Amino acid sequence: MAKTELAVAELIWNMIARKTGNVGKVDFFPQKPAFPFGEGFPGREEAEQPLERAIPETQGISSARIAAFLKDLALHESIDIHQIMLVRNGKVICECGFAPYPAGMWHASYSMCKSITGMAIGMLIAEGKLKLGDKVIDVFHTRKNLFNIFRLKDVTVENLLDMTSCVSFNETGIVSGNDWVRGYLESGLAGVPGRDFEYNSMNTYMLSAMITEITGESLMEYLRPRLWEPMGIRRIFWETCPKGITKGGWGLFICPEDAAKLGMLY
């Protein structure tokens, strides 16, 4: 059993035994800043490049149908909607916030942000700094040893993107310590890389770590001149791991309009 698996097993056992004092193995510190509301945000109008607004009917959509849709959402007890924005032909035809959430503030994007990490990897490939067939262990060459060279010899960048790495170290394992890259590279495999699908957010985290390893910049810093600034995306926040690496697969807070801009790219 790998060190990470042993650490997780120990943590679970201590919780069962009610030995919870100093049980954590990960250094925690608050990260998320207060959301920058209002007109006072520096350069907001000039930098954020808001999408054009339009009356629904001018884009072939009935306002009455949209109003009925919003009412159904508000009355549906099993749906906890925070905000909704409808974009048609590149124009915003509806935006709504459901109490107590005001329209226009950021929200956790969960796994939607994996697509943004994928964009960054595509940019890195376009710049000639990475290839889909590159081996993960070669990117992190300073961490090579006899064990992980053998175990991870077939795991490629493409396997991380399409969730076929088969690496066992997943989100559960991050409670075992601060160095998540080490935990991933020391992990075993639960299948055949490139053949077996296993959804694992740590694959996307490792893509983010690759960007830092190759460029010396965090994923957030790397995307700033390539994506955030050109698209006017300013009010955004992405959590980092204890080592300062952007999480990549989760932890992104983004405004609905900015998420819509990214969706329009495809």
Residue ranges and their predicted role:
Residues 203-210, 250-266:
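Active-site-proximal alpha-helical segments within enzyme catalytic domains
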Residues 1-102, 126-130:
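N-terminal leader/targeting segments and the immediately adjacent pre-domain N-terminus
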Residues 127-165, 186, 215-250, 254:
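Active-site helix/loop module of the DD-peptidase/beta-lactamase fold
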